[in-house]
Amino acid sequence: MLIRWKSKDKSASSNQSVGGSSSSSSKKKRKGREGEEDWQNEAKSGRLPSNEQGGDERRRAMRRDDPRRHTLGGDMLVYGSQHPHAHQMAPQQQRAMDLEMSTRAQKNKKNQPMRGYAPVNQGPLFDDDPGIMSEVETASTGFRRGGKQRSSLPVVRTPSKTLERPLGLVFLQYRSETKRALLPNEITSIDTVRALFVRSFPRQLTMSYLEGPNVKIYIHDASKDMFYELEDVRSHLREIRDRSVLRLFESTEVAAPPQILPGGPGIPQPLPQAQANWDQDQSYFSEPEFDSDYKHQHIHKSKIGKQPAPYYVGSSQTLPRGMYSSERNKVSMDGYTSSPERSSRGNYEEPYYSQYGTRGAVVAPIIDEEQSDGTMTEDQYALYGIKVGPGPNRLTHRGNQIYDPTRPEDLHRIRVEHMERQLANLTGLVQKALVNQNPQIAPLAVPTLDPNYLVVPSQMQANGSGDELYIREKAPKLGKNSCQKSVSFEKSVSFSDDIQGIPKSHNPLHAAETKPTKPAIKSSTLPRTSSQERDRLKPPPPPKPIVLAQTAHPNYRADIALAPEVYNHLRGLQKKAKDLRMEVRTLRRLSQAQAVAVREDIKGTFMRIRATLLASSGSFWDHQGDQDATRISREEELYKQEVIRLEKDLSDLEGSVENLRGEVINRRTRVNMTAVEDMALVLSRASKTVAELKLKFPSLSNGLRCILSNEMEKVVREEKFLKEEPDRLESALRRCKKLTGTLVTLKRLASVQEQRLPPNEPTISEETPRSADISAPDKPIPTPRMGSFALSGGLAPENALDALLDELKTFSKPIAQQQQQQQQQQQQQQQQHQHQQLYEIRPEDSASDESAQAAVQSTVTTQISQARLYTEASVNVQQATTGSMVIAVASGTVSAQAQAQRGVLTHQQSQSQAQLMVHTNMGSLRRLHSYPSESDGELPGPPPTGPRASETSSSTSLANGGSSSKPPVPERNAELITKVGHKRIPPPPPPRTSSRSPLASPTSPNVPPNQAAAATVNLIPNSNSNASANANANANSNATGNKGIVGETTSVVSGDTSSGDNSSGNESGNDHVQRQVALEMRHQELLKKQKMLQEQYQRLQQMSKLPSVDVASSSSSSAQDIASGSNTLRKLGSETNIQQKIAALSLACETSGAAAAAAAAAAAAATNGGVVASDATSGAIGGGGGAGAAGAAGASAAAAHSNSNSNSNLNLNLNSQHQTATTTTKQLYETEIL
């Protein structure tokens, strides 16, 4: 197009812009040449000579006069102004036509390139005609609007003109071909998409063909990787974006050859004026259809105005139809008219324009949509005679051509494909409007299309305004073709078949001759042949109706004068037609969707049927063995029947033979040969039967054996299943329990690690023996901390593990088995605990960290053992021997020396703990902080301040053998933890009770402090033997320097949840009193339960055999023993329940196990200062100093002694422990050994 414009500008840029008629004629010639150049050199279209640009601007000025300057109509007006007739057009009429037809003109312009851009006027129109532009031009320049300056514009159009949509690529797939096309600025209708296809596949597709019912456009949905039909709905059209893939599906090949489509390249033979008129008609008619599109396309229109809307290839644009037709004929010859619509449009427009010269005449008859249908357009032309050439004869001839048998067939075929009924209605409406409003329009008889008609300049000029108006109108009609052409360029370009219809009216002439028409765009791109050539190529257009033929162009101009109203009316008709078409498309899509749904339903049903069949077939195969068995059984039956018959025959034969023999012998009768032969036959049959049966029997026997073997296998499998399944279930249950225990242990360890508090907690003494002070081997094994639980009963499961444990209780095995399992688990856990102790003891950590590590270790031990240890001693006695640190959790195992001094502290601690326990009410999980006493000869870390100090002092006093058992270190509250900077207090390595297990501590609210105190005191007597413990305790107490104060701090450490002030040391006294009361109450309860506990002594002995109870000579052995002892008591049940029960057991053992404690103390003394801790729950855990063996022996002896005595107080051995805590442990085992 740029080339065309350039050539036009070069030839007569001023003439093109200013002079309409003279320049138009030259432009026609140029456009004929340029059309060829354009399609060949569309890329060059970007260059518009300045002259052409000036001409375009002039055209723009004309458009400015017209309401649609920017539209194709504007260009057409400018073009018309170049033509005398165009100038003759009243400015109002032109404006109105511009308003209405500019969109149509754009569309028509799209169609025009197909028709050919021969007319000189069409030269500017050509520039304006987007159809004239090649894809390259439109791609590179956006598309020329005026064809003048637009060609020079950059590819990206200005936002106002391009609708602010950048160009994008769209991939068009037609059959096996895939092409790229530029997206239009805006896609307002499906016609734009069709135009894209027509433009990309000019030789294969035409707008009319695409509009057929058997051709559908599908868009690819990348997310679903599927194509779905593209509906002519904004929501669907918006989905066409850059890189979208559009596919054209057709049930049949392109039905009509391009010649059928109006605007076929061969068709554009009409005179340029006639073409111009036809353009006007087309744009006029097409405009309603494309109105919405063109409104969106106005930018394109403006562009087209500047450049003959390159997308509107149809010559129906402002270019003179004669020129278009001639060029289009060339195009058709070139084969660009292969797209039926484009070629047909161009042909119709050109022939009619050439014939009619005036666009006015053409305007009325042409409806782009109908024409785009091809048949409708031609019929419309024929009916309206709108494309009346300069001479009415030509119009008539053209009408005749429209009605020519060849043309009608193609047109009707296309019409049927493209909503024939709707188009027919539109045609009727348009005809009425044109005939009524424009009575002057008479069918111009144009028996033949002569190049003269195309060339007729007078008519062109006379109808110049009409042509311009018509072109504007036609541009909208071209919209379809133009849209086809410009589809890649703009949405705004609407694909109005009616616009094409004008060229289609030409098409009746051309379509028959040239079936292949290039897509509108390409046809525009193609050099336009002269209208004469087109006429030569095309059969003479069918004569138009007499009315149309009669109407002269001037008359048509008169109609054009009425054009504004007519255009509006036609526009409304076109819009209605478009709405109807949209509805039809919607219905079609709905039907398609329904068909898809039905297909899916059928497919689903098929799949279900198939699945059923497969299942049945599978069952068939499953029952194949049964079928074999049935077959064999049938064979067996047949075999038996044969045997029966055989035996019968033999018996009969034998009888007969014997009778005959007897008769012969006795009676000496003659033997009848026949009888003998009969018998011989029977015998032969019998012998054969026997042979056959003998042959059959092996296979039968094999089959029977197989069946029997299979049955035997089934029986064996069933028996094996019945026999092994219970064991399998039991093993699975055991595994579940084991895993549960492991998870519980890991949970405790994690909780301990997470709950450590910083050493400098305000409520807890910041200074505690540092891990550095205590060597890892010497560090006492943390006694298992009691799970939190209340004396009254276990708390609700704390977490999913507890719930799981409760559920597993139902499957718990007898206590003996449980104990064995627990022992094994305890041993494993002991090893883990030892490793964890080493791992968790960090010398760099503060005392709190150290205690936390110890607590972690204790947590690793079973909760039951922890509960016992804690409840018996109600204090964790930490004694570190030089060789090893053994935590002796014996309420009474404290050196006698430290008893007197620390008895008060322990009482205070117990009281404070009792208070704390009562306040906590098993609230947040609390852990009593006890600090490990340092190894003998080692002084404890600096005296702890605050509750931890008291805690430490209490532990040391107990280690020293204080008169009273060391009360458990006060528990930690969640509140206390929160106060401590949201860091969890590190659990002390010595046994501690969590807040959940108030029973564990002698100060638990349910137990009177007296009981607790008594229990603690009862367990103390043998603590004198623990020299090392005493030394450690003394050292610790000395280091602290405040023995009395230590107890207070310890009590404070546990903290009172209600008060929240656990750091006050004054509370220790009250705590001690409460603790004693709780202990006293517990003592009474435990005395009652002692007998019950003894009953379980036998069961507990198995657990008591564990070495953990004995005092180990080495710290490691003692640690293992302690861990094992704790493990024996350790259950996988919920920590709370186990701890509660263990606490009760431990208290009972503490009260009743004084003798056992004494024995344990003696054993400890034998161990050279080893500390014997007799814990009701966990037994006496002693860390021996020098001679661990002696300590162990003593401990065992003490355990045996305590066992002999009814006192079931826990000795070093677990036997005494379990004996004293029999009832509670039994319950614990039954409920929580899991």
Swiss-Prot record:
Transmembrane segments: none annotated. Residues 1-88, 107-129, 330-350, 498-548, 754-793, 815-852, 928-1011, 1028-1070 are annotated as: Disordered. GO terms for cellular component: cytoplasm. The keyword Coiled coil applies. Keywords: Coiled coil. Residues 412-436, 565-594, 630-666, 1077-1105 form a coiled coil. Residues 12-25, 817-837, 952-965, 993-1004, 1028-1039, 1046-1068 have a biased composition (Low complexity). Residues 1-11, 55-69 have a biased composition (Basic and acidic residues). Pfam families: AIP3 (PF03915). PANTHER family: COILED-COIL DOMAIN-CONTAINING PROTEIN CG32809 (PTHR22741:SF10), P140CAP/SNIP-RELATED (PTHR22741). This is Coiled-coil domain-containing protein CG32809. It comes from Drosophila melanogaster.
